[in-house]
């Protein structure tokens, strides 16, 4: 006879009091991912355009990035966060709108830094599209 399925006990997320943190905005051509961490790098909140219900080419729009940033900011503010340092990575269209959404949500932005990786002539890029 098969043993009964064990119940998985999920730990309840405790509310940490983190006054300042780091917001990482990764804006690719297909999606925008926002992650807010504490200064040590431990993730406090995250959200993405695809996770907020946008599919296909709508994930890469500035509006989708704005919705994802608002959601992530709300989660982080539940932990008592008030000010962030912003690191922006990638060439996507959601860069500016995600940043504006974080500011509109009530965060005090200490500084904004572009950390897009630029190759020193590394890998060959994909060939140009012919439509």
UniProtKB/Swiss-Prot annotation:
Gene3D superfamilies: Ribosomal protein S11. Signal peptide: none annotated. GO terms for molecular function: rRNA binding; structural constituent of ribosome. GO terms for cellular component: ribonucleoprotein complex; ribosome. The keyword RNA-binding applies. GO terms for biological process: translation. Belongs to the universal ribosomal protein uS11 family. Part of the 30S ribosomal subunit. Interacts with proteins S7 and S18. Binds to IF-3. This is Small ribosomal subunit protein uS11. The lineage of its organism: Bacteria, Pseudomonadati, Thermodesulfobacteriota, Desulfuromonadia, Geobacterales.
């Amino acid at each position: 006879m098969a043993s009964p399925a064990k119940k998985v006990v999920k730990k309840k997320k405790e509310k940490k009091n983190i006054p300042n943190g780091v917001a990482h905005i990764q804006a690719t051509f297909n999606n925008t991912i926002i992650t807010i961490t504490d200064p040590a790098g431990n993730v406090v909140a995250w959200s993405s355009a695809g996770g907020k219900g946008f599919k296909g080419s709508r994930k890469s729009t500035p509006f989708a990035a704005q919705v994802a940033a608002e959601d992530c900011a709300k989660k982080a503010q539940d932990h008592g966060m008030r000010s962030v340092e912003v690191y922006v990575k990638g060439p996507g269209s959601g860069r500016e709108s995600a940043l504006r959404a974080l500011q509109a949500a009530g965060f005090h932005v200490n500084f904004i830094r572009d950390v897009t990786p630029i190759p020193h002539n590394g890998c060959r890029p994909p060939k140009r599209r012919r439509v």
